[in-house]
Amino acid sequence: MKLSNLLLFANVGTLLVKATDENISPNEENTPRYAQFNIDYSVLDQPNYDPMAPMEFENGENITLAFNFANNEEVPVKLIAVGGNIINARSGDEVANITRSSLGEIEVDVNTSVSFNQAINLKLDEGDYFLLPNVFVLKEGELMAVGTSPSRIKILPPPMSFFNPKFLSIQAVLIGVISYFTYFIFRSSKKERRGVVSKTKAPKKVKLDESWLPENHLKK
């Protein structure tokens, strides 16, 4: 799925795509269809959720989407499952599918709304993505995927392990630097102590020439 298609999903209108190929005439096959559904969702793991601001997660992390589905059609519908796609923000290509999870046929009457949660596992490489959930709706026996607005997500680099070679090399450099400065400070301190000791030594006795002294000043 390219980015141009992704932006189409972000509009207020809801684009419907049939989930089965039954009863599709050639004229209807490429014709987008719209329905009177309003779907909003937030991310429970992000208290200050903003669909335009990137949300940061780690690879393999689970997130929970809180949906609100409003049925403005003239007939009741049933919510069957949640699925969707994940789009690379740079290339616009689809990189993963959101595993379809059953909702157990939640019935939604005319002009009513329901709320439900769905957990999604993010198994992605480091980078920026668009999350595009779909809700599968059963209307008068016809199953369709109802697109929602995209959310931006950012997968963070994995935390560096203590035994990671890069981390070990950093440790070796730090240990070397600390050892060098410790040795340098120790040598400098030792030299200073030697200097103080040499300055405080008792003066040497000087032998005087007594030949010029009077006899009465000479020690007996």
From Swiss-Prot:
The chain crosses the membrane at residues 167-186. Residues 20-166 are lumenal. It is found in: Endoplasmic reticulum membrane. Keywords: Endoplasmic reticulum, Membrane, Signal, Transmembrane, Transmembrane helix. Its main location: endoplasmic reticulum. GO terms for cellular component: endoplasmic reticulum membrane. InterPro entries: TRAP_alpha. It is a single-pass type I membrane protein. Residues 1-19 form the signal peptide. Residues 187-220 are cytoplasmic. Is probably involved in a pathway contributing to genomic integrity. Belongs to the IRC22 family. This is Increased recombination centers protein 22.
